[in-house]
Amino acid sequence: MKNLNNLFLFALISLLTVSLNAQSVDEIIENYFENTGGAENWENVQGMKMNASINQMGMEIPIEMVQLKDKMYTKISVQGMDIKQGVFDGETLWSTNFMSMKAEKSDQEDVQIVKDELAEFPDPFLNYKENGFTAELMGTEVVDGSDTFKVKLTKKPMVVDGEEVPNVSTYYFDTENFVPIMMHEEVMSGPGKGMIMEAKMSDYQEVEGLYMPFSMSQGVKDQPGQPLTITSIELNVEADESEFKFPETETEVQENN
């Protein structure tokens, strides 16, 4: 009987632990949205434009990023030239080749990955359960001197090089303010396959009632990241459709005429 009671007690504790873990994850996410303006206000965000800059060898390089629910582009201004990266018009994904300075289209696997990422806009934790994602509290961890909740977000698998691979991001939420200050993702293809990419976020400021990070850095885990300073953020902007269009070559223009 004693062993039976112990077994029952162990099972009860296990159930409570699972329940508390799930509740804690939900509480962290709820507090995150509450502290950054409210989930309802986040749901009203249909588009976002960010102006930022990075420093390369002492030279400040302006960057303009526009993201909508189905389109996006990044424009980098270098020595009077605008170079576009990660441009998506809803169907075609393209970027400017830095060597040839010509626009090149991406394959359909990359197109689908971008479509899935845009479906998460403006935040992957917003309605994450309805999107089929799961969130799990992995414990606590100290990040740059701050205590954080380590939350693993598992999204729908993505297809890379013809194979279905896991799609997992790990977020580190500050335990005091409940905002993410770091995020990790594993590189699933290319020369950096297997590496852990690290993004850090800080200097949260108010933008039309919502709080967003104005200082970021991105790079490989355990290596110095590239700092990104955001100078302005606009919400629900009306973007020029021509900014997303894949540029036609002179030959294509002549053929169309």
Where are the regions a protein language model picked out?
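Gly/Pro-enriched, hydrophobic low-complexity segments
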Residues: D147-F244
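Short capping micro-motif at the N-terminus of alpha-helices
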Residues: I63, Q85, E104-K105, K150, ...
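Short, surface-exposed beta-strand-loop junctions and turns on beta-sheet-rich folds
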Residues: G80-D82, M101-A103, V187-S189, V220
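Short, solvent-exposed loop/turn elements at beta->coil junctions and helix N-caps
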Residues: S53, M138-V142, E186, Y204
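N-terminal mature ectodomain segment of secretory-pathway/periplasmic proteins
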Residues: E27-M101, G139
